[in-house]
């Protein structure tokens, strides 16, 4: 099932316009407010869409109501014909207007938290990464690639291996401590394409009775499907796998040096289509982070021009360190 998801551009606004939008246009439109705990950050959803409120509650851990938000996302049906995304970076306030796709709600909430971390300078470098991560006996592996290349499919394929546990299928937080990289999950439950069963046969029976949204997706508790041990909150990152699809390159899997990995991540806009602020200063911050990440991990390039099963075998060998 192929469903077209609309693209969006981010309009950066100033604090005055943000205040005017809230006070004069949208304050009376908000029916629900929910705070999420994103690795210790408080991101608040304000919406008039009940379905999104309920999916948010399933998707994220809740935050104590006494904690003031580090960022906010207004998700409102205003009756407009076109979806709009506006962002005010000083207060970390995002507006997602006239959108019917929950994937953008959760991705923009995570993007707001990532923008906060980029501006929060601390002893330990903390950043967010758009990618999947799994744990195998305390050893973490991240799969970072542009959207649509197959990182989510590969992550769920790995979960069928004994002792492999999911940290996240889409987005994670990192903390660089000395020569190590700690990885933290971003979501309580995952928002996934249920047609992943067409790629991984063993999931077909497990996912057949799941209730879907209009985009063929659902927020799913992976533990209920694969058991309580299927997910883990954190791991120590040892391996990074980048995916590419290049029929002119006959090499299917290889280790790469920091310089090639940096070129890959820069050429692919940090493999993150949901970055809210794109300017020279932000680019330098992100490049510096990935340089530190690559210095502390073993980086692999996997070419996805072969079959899903063959790629899964190659990635499995990296994760299991065979």
Predicted regions and their residues:
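Glycine-rich, often acidic-flanked micro-motifs
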Residues: 1-26, 130-146, 160, 164-322
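Conserved lysine of the Walker
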Residues: 151
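Post-Walker A alpha-helix
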Residues: 154-155
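Extreme N-terminal, non-catalytic leader segments
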Residues: 78-139
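Short Pro/Gly-enriched beta-strand edge/turn motifs at strand-loop
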Residues: 15-18, 68, 111-117, 272
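Structural alpha-beta junctions
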Residues: 66-72, 118-121, 163-164, 296, ...
């Amino acid at each position: 099932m192929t469903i077209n998801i609309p693209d969006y551009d981010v309009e950066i606004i100033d604090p005055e316009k943000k205040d005017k939008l809230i006070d004069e246009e949208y304050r009376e439109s908000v029916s629900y407010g929910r705070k999420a705990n994103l690795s210790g950050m408080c991101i608040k959803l304000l919406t008039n869409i009940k379905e999104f409120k309920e999916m948010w509650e399933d998707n994220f851990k809740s935050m104590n109501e006494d904690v003031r938000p580090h960022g906010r996302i207004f998700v409102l049906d205003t009756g407009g014909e076109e979806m709009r995304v506006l962002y005010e970076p000083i207060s970390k306030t995002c507006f997602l207007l006239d959108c019917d796709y929950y994937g953008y709600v959760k991705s923009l909430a995570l993007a707001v938290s990532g923008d906060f971390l980029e501006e929060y300078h601390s002893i330990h470098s903390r950043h967010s990464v758009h990618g999947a991560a799994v744990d195998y006996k305390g050893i973490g592996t991240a799969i970072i690639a542009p959207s649509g290349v197959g990182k989510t499919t590969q992550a769920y394929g790995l979960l069928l291996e004994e002792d492999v546990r999911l940290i996240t299928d889409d987005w994670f937080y990192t903390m660089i401590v000395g020569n190590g990289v700690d990885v933290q999950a971003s979501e309580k439950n995952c928002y996934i394409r249920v047609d992943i069963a067409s790629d991984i046969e063993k999931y077909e029976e497990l996912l057949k009775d799941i209730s879907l949204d209009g985009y063929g997706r659902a927020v799913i508790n992976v533990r209920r499907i694969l058991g309580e041990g299927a997910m883990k909150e954190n791991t120590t990152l040892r391996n990074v796998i980048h995916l590419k699809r290049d029929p002119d390159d006959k090499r299917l899997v290889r280790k790469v040096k920091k310089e090639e990995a940096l070129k890959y991540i820069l050429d692919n806009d940090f493999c993150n289509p949901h970055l809210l602020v794109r300017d020279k200063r932000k680019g330098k911050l992100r490049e510096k982070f990935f340089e530190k990440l690559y210095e502390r991990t073993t980086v692999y390039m996997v070419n996805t021009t072969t079959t899903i099963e063959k790629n899964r075998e190659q990635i499995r060998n990296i994760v299991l360190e065979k």
